[in-house]
Amino acid sequence: MIVCTTENIAGYRIDKTFGEVFGLTTRSRNLVRTFGAGLKTLVGGEVVTWTQLQDQARLEAIERLKNNADKIGANAVTMMRFDSNEANGIMSVVAYGTAVKVSEL
């Protein structure tokens, strides 16, 4: 499965457009780690726990995007983007794009 952030894929032509496809994940933060991260904000610097959580969520959202595209017969996703939201310690990440069928030129 090819996933790209561009409208076209070099060396491929788009044979069919299926439309929008997405992958979503929602995760909660570990209470103990959140407390430690809160202390980290007092002294400054990267909050590694939150960075890792967001990285894992983005990877999971991409995998779900690929699975959803595959289910409808696509072999690529173009114009892939991310959106995220966090409220009350719960983070949602969505990866979305256009599911397409491509073939090599």
Curated annotation (Swiss-Prot):
It comes from the Bacteria. Pfam families: YbjQ_1 (PF01906). InterPro entries: UPF0145_dom_sf, UPF0145_YbjQ-like. HAMAP family: UPF0145 (MF_00338). Belongs to the UPF0145 family. This is UPF0145 protein OEOE_0637.
